[in-house]
From Swiss-Prot:
One of its GO terms (molecular function) is transaminase activity. Residues 38-57 bind DNA. The modification N6-(pyridoxal phosphate)lysine is found at residue 319. The lineage of its organism: Bacteria, Pseudomonadati, Pseudomonadota, Alphaproteobacteria, Hyphomicrobiales. Transmembrane segments: none annotated. This is Probable rhizopine catabolism regulatory protein MocR. GO terms for biological process: biosynthetic process. Could play a regulatory role in the transcription of the moc genes for rhizopine catabolism. Could also have an aminotransferase activity. The keyword Signal does not apply. Keywords: Aminotransferase, DNA-binding, Pyridoxal phosphate, Transcription, Transcription regulation, Transferase. CDD domains: AAT_like (cd00609), WHTH_GntR (cd07377). Its cofactor is pyridoxal 5'-phosphate. The gene is mocR. The keyword Transcription applies.
Amino acid sequence: MLVLDRDADVPMHRQLYEKLRAEILAGHLKADTRLPPTRMMAEDLGVSRNTVITTYDALLAEGYLESRSGSGTWVATLPPDAVTARNSVGRAGAPSLSSRGMRMAAQPRDRTIPDRIAFHPGYPEIKAFPFSTWARLLKRHARYSHEDLYGYHWVTGHPRLKAAIAEYLRASRGVECAPEQVIVVNGTQAALDILARMLVDEGDICWMEEPGYIGAQNSLLSAGAKLVPLPVERDGWSLEDETRPSPRLIFVTPSCQWPLGCLMRMEDRLRLLQIGERHDAWIVEDDYDSEYRFRGRPVPAMQGLDKSGRVIYMGTFAKTLFPSLRIGFIVVPPQLADGFKRVVSNTGHYPSLLLQAALADFISEGYFATHLRRMRRLYAERQKVFVALCRRHLADWLTIDENDAGMQLVARFTRALEDEVLWRAAQGQGVNFSPLSRQFFHSPPQQGAILGYAGIDPKTMREGINSLRSAFLALESSGALPLDRATAAPRGC
């Protein structure tokens, strides 16, 4: 029987990881033993389901467990000598990871598995990118013309790219900044890692949207932060709560909330700025998917409304161009620019200057604006097609939360069903999506599917939805899905 110590300094997920690992290595949990579902294990131990998911993920990643499509999580077969060796190493007291390393290794991840059809959220239509233009711009700078492009210069970004980003943000998002305030980094996760290093101390309170971006959760937790949920509901963000402890940092995605797609109203933006000032807290504004608003007028970024210099703005080109470009940016208050420069230099979180030079031309010569307009039209049309297909073929099992922006939609189940169960069944049909429950870290998770549509053409969309339909039918025939419709769960935004 597994017993966890609630008074110990070791996090619950780490205790559970160590105990399950020890049981496997000792042979008490034998190969081909099926582990309880995450919800059942959580109820038996009196912990959150995310604690169990985090533990299972860590053991899956290290090869102690294996996931079998449609049948759950099982103990993997380990070579006998490996078990003996690992046991002896453990008894000898081998060096272990640091506390920070343990936190990082144990963080949950949004698993993606190679598959035939992937409803990946936030994935752009790469085939529509003007690669011939991009190749020409790269070739322009690939010829040796200036030593600065091939050395360790400009660690916070190519000057022309910083200027182009600053001008674009001023014109399109109302962001007020000089080029010197723009820090160019290796994508969103690099930005989050730098922000966590620079702004958060061990034990600091951070308000985090729930449901919210798992990458931000992981970066803050790895820095030793204590996450306090900032609930996102149908009528907006739950900002006022006197029982919520004073934060050091507040993380929000106000332009297209991840994953629900809500838009934070102007009055809530102003209220959040007041809250940040009252608590002397940093506000990290991830302007996720702000470029893809299909209806209504865009709301300016919070950074441009900030009068006290506490909003740090971040964005990425992964969603507007292509993911492997790995170029993102942070806009920091002027007084932080020099400190961020030193951290970026020391961590190596800066992308290729050759790519930056080509991107600067891509923006300044108008190709970026043209591509955005084209993608906005394409994604708006794909959203209409996707919603219509879901309503036509999947209405017996789910409803779609429509919104006016973004590259994905949230589907809610009309019957009692765990999204991880559907996820495993969908894998068996060659389809992948992101379960909604993985985006919760504190409250009982809502069940649903985050379905990306932007990077999928209508023909593939139909195939994927038919495969999802087959997954639902398979669950019905196996008895895993009740035939009666359940009361709809809270719909969020």
